Amino acid sequence: MARDKTRIKRKERKNIATGVAHVNSSFNNTKILISDVQGNAISWSSAGTMGFKGSRKSTPYAAQMAAEDAGKKAQEHGVRTLEVEVQGPGSGRESALRALAAVGFNITAIRDVTPIAHNGCRPPKRRRV
């Protein structure tokens, strides 16, 4: 059986000066997506893709490593300034923000876009440990 020759699609380098970093920090994981102003994804990373498993994904250190990874990928596409949108109640919010600043981005705005229910769904019951 002959093998089909498929071309491997290379990532083209985009030249984007400003971007938006979406930091989604839940109780179990932290995901970072860096997009352009229109919302098209440039780079992304999460604590799970960095190799952390289980409860280690929810640590601030895992969020820091994921933010550094997404930031370095975005810098290859020419992103220099960022607006940061933070969402969720997790522990990786602050450390992901600090890591993005440490990579060398000029952060112009920080917005908290966590959805707040106006007496919507019933929350989960309290844990008894």
Curated annotation (Swiss-Prot):
A molecular function GO annotation: rRNA binding
PROSITE patterns: RIBOSOMAL_S11
SUPFAM superfamilies: Translational machinery components
Keywords assigned: Ribonucleoprotein, Ribosomal protein, RNA-binding, rRNA-binding
HAMAP family, per the entry: Ribosomal_uS11 (MF_01310)
Protein family membership: Belongs to the universal ribosomal protein uS11 family.
Descriptive protein name: Small ribosomal subunit protein uS11
Source organism of the structure: Paracoccus denitrificans (strain Pd 1222)
Lineage of the organism: Bacteria, Pseudomonadati, Pseudomonadota, Alphaproteobacteria, Rhodobacterales
